[in-house]
């Protein structure tokens, strides 16, 4: 790939409002099973789908999950990204903050690019025959700096979610 021109593509992920997404990079065919087991161990009520793009061998999108809709959604997004060794996790009835340590602890996981409920787009770089994730566009830009009222509202929200006493 040395000396090959690079092109960039923005891939907007398909995601209902009530679904969170985690996008990362891993390696090895065992990734799908290990991510599934890590997620399943967090909570019996967590619904999820996982898709992983192989970068060599059969070069298939490997998939798993406990929710058919979320698994299909993860596969469609992985196919759209089409970057070697990338993975997509779609979550419902739980938040990324509840699973991030488990996801990052999976031995095959190299990087987590994003974990969000926001609209998200993946910046994909293509060079020669390969594709890779160059970056993430997560949500919208800020419109100001929080006031004391905003700080109080943030603290209330975290307590409503049960993350703070």
Where are these regions (language model features)?
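N-terminal, charge-rich interaction modules
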Residues: 1-63, 148-165
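Structural motif
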Residues: 19-22, 46-51, 60, 85-88, ...
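Gly/Ser/Thr-rich loops at beta-strand to alpha-helix junctions
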Residues: 27-30, 56-57, 66-68, 92-97, ...
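Short, well-structured alpha-helical interface segments that form or flank functional binding sites
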Residues: 30-34, 84, 98
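General "foldedness" signal
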Residues: 35, 49, 53, 62-66, ...
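Hydrophobic side chains in well-ordered alpha-helices
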Residues: 35-38, 74, 99-102
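Aromatic-anchored, charged helix-turn/loop surface patch used as a conserved interaction hotspot
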Residues: 50-88
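Helix-rich interaction surfaces within compact, conserved domain-sized segments
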Residues: 77-83, 94-165
